[in-house]
């Protein structure tokens, strides 16, 4: 392998990626301190070299001239005076091109700027001692696409946005492969800054600054680039997380295969538009959860279109984190419940908001709908704030007295099943697990009121309306518990569609809109009626413990967990279970993900038809 110019740039000890030890760069690459990229800046501001047959570098006619290559600096775009050690140009002979379409995430991969195929660096024998997985600051052409028939690799200077993106991608990948419960959010001081400091020379050709001002700059960069990074500035109220762990940052798009370099040629641009490639950022509209996620994507969208969409007062909804719910949100408490809202694409005449008669008036709820995530997870808002939910929303840790969390989706008819594994149950801790209706008290144990039914770890007692009865032996750490419910399909609840919430008030919290619903607990309790032929059954390590309850109260039931002190449990909504029941037929709770989307969409459409919203010519408060 022959290297062009003065030789390779910043060197590190042998070994690719995070295993390499950093060393100092050359004097030609020194800068006083890095500056955060401006709004909208990213890898696209550092264009890749486009070699041509007419370009040549002194000493080798087959190597490209990189003396005019542009790169990011604190003063914007500057032209390098020479190749020096500020970049690496490698031109190597390779026997064949990797034709595999599969990715090797976690390895140093390179994307060809012409054919857009991905290759591992080992395919061409490229020295990766100064490289990291998920890097974006390079230009690469495979030996088939390059005019010389050799492989072209140029390592460029990275701006802070690219460095933060690479750091978070590597931290996310490490957590996925090493942690039992992978994280998606990482502490600025404990995770991100130490990672960048350790691998600075692997992440950029820029000289490590003498002044320690770059940590503040990376925080500003990630806080500003909300189309790429998630930001959580403070722990949830009542959380045990120490305040010094915050702010925390994560990637908005958790698909790490979307991370790649930014090439200027049109072929790469079109490929990025189609695939939603991060290219140092996230393509506008490529992510976003909820029922309208796919519809929001603009095929062949342009920057002008994106800006226009953002200025729209109705459809300027914020993009959601990977798990489908805002990091900072209102909690269901004090007699009020909050349902995340998104623009309803089927609502007629959304332009009416621009009329003068709507100035200063609340946005009508019929223009929005409940925002549903297609996966069943533990609810972030429908829980006691002191409970700690894992990043994947499948594990919960208790805190002090009994408190409860419900799942994001509930069932109104049919037979359903889910599992819970007791991960940790220290002495003097306990759990009550089972099913709850939406009005079940979150600051009380499951089974406290008429709206919930539970199974306690101690002595296996079952609870409903705070009345405990012997049911089975208890359970503890390591046990896998199953929860089955069967609701008849001939009840009024079963035949009804879910609430559209369109008649509820819309409130704004941290840039997101929510429907606000008042709880009428006393009225709901008086209207409860038993449902014949309904039943709840619990399982312990695959063994049926018998029918716990029959003829339960009619309603919509959610999987629910209540914990006493620092007990930790994980929930599995399916479709694969460790101990699937063999004596019953059922649907896994995971099926309710798309099932709820269908039900709510039908309810929304019927609402528009039945209320004749299209014919409304004035606000509802006007005659």
Curated annotation (Swiss-Prot):
The modification Phosphoserine is found at residues 96, 311. Residues 63-172 are annotated as: DNA-binding. Residues 230-247 have a biased composition (Basic and acidic residues). Its main location: nucleus. A zinc finger (C4-type) spans 112-145. Ubiquitously expressed, with abundant expression in the heart, skeletal muscle and kidney. Low expression is seen in spleen, lung and testis. Residues 84-95, 265-277 have a biased composition (Polar residues). Transcriptional regulator. Component or associated component of some histone methyltransferase complexes which regulates transcription through recruitment of those complexes to gene promoters. Component of the Set1/Ash2 histone methyltransferase (HMT) complex, a complex that specifically methylates 'Lys-4' of histone H3, but not if the neighboring 'Lys-9' residue is already methylated. As part of the MLL1/MLL complex it is involved in methylation and dimethylation at 'Lys-4' of histone H3. May play a role in hematopoiesis. This is Set1/Ash2 histone methyltransferase complex subunit ASH2. It comes from Mus musculus.
């Amino acid at each position: 392998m022959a290297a062009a110019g003065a030789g390779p740039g910043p060197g590190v000890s042998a070994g690719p990626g995070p295993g390499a030890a950093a060393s100092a760069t050359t004097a030609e690459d020194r800068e006083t301190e890095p500056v955060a990229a401006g709004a909208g800046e990213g890898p696209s501001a550092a264009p890749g070299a486009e070699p041509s047959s007419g370009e040549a570098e002194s000493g080798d006619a087959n190597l490209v001239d990189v003396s005019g290559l542009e790169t990011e600096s604190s003063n914007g775009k500057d032209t390098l005076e020479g190749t020096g050690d500020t970049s690496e140009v490698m031109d190597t002979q390779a026997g064949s091109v990797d034709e595999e379409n599969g990715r090797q995430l976690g390895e140093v991969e390179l994307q060809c700027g012409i054919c857009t195929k991905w290759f591992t660096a080992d395919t061409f024998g490229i020295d990766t001692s100064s490289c990291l997985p998920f890097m974006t600051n390079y230009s690469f052409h495979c030996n088939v696409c390059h005019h010389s028939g050799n492989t072209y690799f140029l390592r460029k200077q990275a701006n802070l946005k690219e460095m933060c993106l690479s750091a978070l991608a590597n931290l996310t990948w490490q957590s996925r492969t090493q942690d039992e419960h992978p994280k998606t959010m990482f502490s600025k001081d404990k995770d991100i800054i130490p990672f960048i400091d350790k691998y600075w020379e692997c992440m950029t050709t820029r000289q490590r600054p003498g002044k320690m001002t770059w940590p503040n700059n990376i925080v500003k960069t990630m806080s500003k680039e909300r189309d790429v990074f998630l930001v959580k500035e403070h722990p949830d109220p009542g959380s045990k997380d120490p305040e010094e762990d915050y702010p925390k940052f994560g990637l908005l798009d958790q698909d790490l295969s979307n991370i790649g370099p930014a090439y200027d040629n049109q072929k790469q641009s079109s490929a990025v538009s189609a695939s939603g490639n991060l290219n140092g950022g996230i393509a506008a509209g490529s992510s976003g959860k909820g029922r309208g996620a796919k519809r929001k994507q603009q095929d062949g969208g342009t920057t002008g279109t994106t800006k226009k969409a953002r200025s729209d007062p109705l459809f300027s909804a914020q993009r959601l984190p990977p798990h489908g719910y805002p990091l900072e949100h209102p909690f269901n408490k004090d007699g009020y419940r909050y349902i995340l809202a998104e623009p309803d694409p089927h609502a007629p005449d959304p332009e009416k908001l621009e009329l003068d008669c709507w100035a200063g008036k609340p946005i009508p709820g019929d223009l929005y709908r409940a925002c549903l995530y297609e996966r069943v997870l533990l609810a972030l808002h429908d829980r006691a704030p002191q409970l700690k939910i894992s990043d994947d929303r499948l594990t919960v840790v208790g805190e002090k007295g009994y408190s409860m969390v419900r799942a994001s989706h509930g069932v109104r008819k049919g037979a359903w099943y889910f599992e819970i594994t007791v991960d940790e149950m220290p002495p003097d801790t306990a759990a009550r697990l089972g099913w709850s209706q939406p009005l079940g008290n979150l600051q009380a144990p499951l089974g406290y009121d008429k709206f919930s039914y539970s199974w306690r770890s101690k002595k296996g007692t079952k609870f409903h309306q705070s009345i405990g009865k012997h049911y089975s032996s208890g359970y503890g750490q390591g046990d896998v518990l199953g929860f089955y419910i069967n609701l008849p399909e001939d009840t009024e609840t079963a035949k009804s569609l879910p609430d559209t919430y369109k008649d509820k008030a819309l409130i704004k919290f941290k840039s997101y809109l929510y429907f606000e619903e008042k709880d009428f607990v006393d009225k709901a309790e008086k209207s409860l009626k038993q449902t014949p032929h309904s039943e709840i059954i619990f399982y312990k390590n695959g063994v049926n413990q018998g029918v716990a309850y029959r003829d339960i109260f009619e309603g919509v039931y959610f999987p629910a967990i209540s914990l006493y002190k620092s007990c930790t449990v994980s929930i599995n909504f399916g479709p694969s279970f460790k101990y699937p029941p063999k004596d019953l037929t059922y649907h896994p709770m995971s099926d309710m993900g798309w099932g709820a989307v269908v039900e709510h969409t039908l309810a929304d459409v019927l609402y528009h038809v039945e209320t004749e919203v299209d014919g409304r010519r004035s606000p509802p408060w006007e005659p």
